[in-house]
């Protein structure tokens, strides 16, 4: 019998998945031996019992059995160990007031415990560390669990919020596209109709353009408002508010990147740039991440970046 056939057969009752397609395999974190669901019900329904695998003396309970997620049992074991350890050692960098060195040391100690438990090294010692830490830090562990739960809820709300906004954006973009297509057709016919009664072609075209400009719906304005809402995502601000205080800026050799006080202010409302505004409405540009503020920021940064650099002074020998 090859390995593939063994994977689909219960080693206890020898039932094959081919004959029982609905058969489920379960494992117990005590020993991670694979047993089918029927054998678990049959052997452990009356209470704790010894693992039916030959040579395994672990006492197993029915309520501890779970569905195996990973095909590799070693991976399954490590994931379970990490989950158990991280539920106790659940500090974040916020608990260290932004001290990355202390936080890294803490993570290293946690990884040592995980490695020891996963590889059977000083298991009793590592279990004692885990138990002692849990007893001494119950309040902190519960507080961090509540905070992590809140962070997850904020993340899910943010995902839902962004999904709804993006759906509305797609609907508005489709509406704008349909209106523009209809306007183009209308312009062609309107120019032809007006030229039948007027000889001034330039005036006719100018009048039609003005009419089209007035006919532009509120969909475009709504789309711009949605883009502003996405840029000023309230959930993003909440989740990142505390981390911004501890933001670490990496070193770069470019001149001007340490100037935190910008010498310019971007006012998109009063600055009219028809080229960039038109690009903002095109799907291929939006899909690639194009934003008007990125363009303005880059151009103005390049313009102001070298103001503090005197070339002659830089060229002088030190």
Curated annotation (Swiss-Prot):
One of its GO terms (biological process) is DNA repair. NCBIfam families: cdk7. A zinc finger (RING-type) spans 10-55. Acts as a component of the general transcription and DNA repair factor IIH (TFIIH or factor B), which is essential for both basal and activated transcription, and is involved in nucleotide excision repair (NER) of damaged DNA. TFIIH as CTD kinase activity and DNA-dependent ATPase activity, and is essential for polymerase II transcription. Transmembrane segments: none annotated. GO terms for cellular component: transcription factor TFIIH holo complex; transcription factor TFIIK complex. GO terms for molecular function: cyclin-dependent protein serine/threonine kinase activator activity; zinc ion binding. It comes from the Eukaryota. CDD domains: RING-HC_TFB3-like. Keywords: Metal-binding, Nucleus, Transcription, Transcription regulation, Zinc, Zinc-finger. It is found in: Nucleus. Coiled coil: none annotated. This is RNA polymerase II transcription factor B subunit 3. It comes from Eremothecium gossypii (strain ATCC 10895 / CBS 109.51 / FGSC 9923 / NRRL Y-1056).
């Amino acid at each position: 019998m090859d390995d593939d056939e063994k994977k689909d057969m219960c080693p206890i009752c020898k039932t094959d998945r081919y004959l029982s397609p609905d058969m489920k395999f379960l494992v117990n974190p005590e020993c991670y031996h694979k047993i089918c669901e029927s054998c678990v019900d049959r052997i452990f329904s009356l209470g704790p019992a010894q693992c039916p695998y030959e040579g395994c003396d672990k006492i197993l309970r029915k309520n501890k059995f779970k569905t195996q997620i990973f095909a590799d049992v070693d991976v399954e074991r490590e994931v379970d160990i990490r989950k158990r350890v991280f539920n106790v050692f659940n500090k974040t960098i916020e608990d260290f007031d932004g001290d990355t060195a202390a936080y890294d040391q803490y993570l290293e100690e946690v990884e040592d415990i995980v490695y020891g438990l996963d590889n059977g090294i000083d298991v009793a010692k590592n279990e004692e560390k885990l138990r002692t830490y849990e007893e001494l830090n119950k309040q902190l562990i519960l507080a961090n669990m509540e905070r992590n739960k809140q962070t997850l809820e904020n993340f899910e709300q943010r995902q839902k919020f962004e999904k709804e906004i993006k759906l509305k954006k797609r609907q508005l973009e489709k509406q704008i596209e349909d209106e523009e297509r209809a306007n183009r057709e209308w312009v062609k016919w309107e120019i032809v109709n007006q030229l039948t009664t007027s000889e001034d072609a330039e005036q006719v075209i100018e009048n039609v353009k003005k009419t089209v400009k007035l006919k532009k719906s509120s969909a475009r304005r709504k789309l711009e408002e949605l883009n502003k809402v996405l840029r000023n995502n309230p959930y993003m601000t909440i989740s990142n508010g505390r981390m911004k205080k501890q933001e670490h800026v990496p070193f770069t050799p470019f001149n001007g990147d340490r100037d935190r006080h910008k010498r310019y202010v971007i006012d998109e409302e009063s600055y009219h740039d028809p080229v960039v505004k038109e690009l903002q409405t095109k799907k291929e540009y939006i899909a690639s991440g194009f934003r008007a503020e990125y363009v303005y920021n880059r151009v103005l940064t390049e313009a102001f970046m070298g103001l503090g650099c005197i070339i002659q002074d830089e060229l002088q020998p030190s």
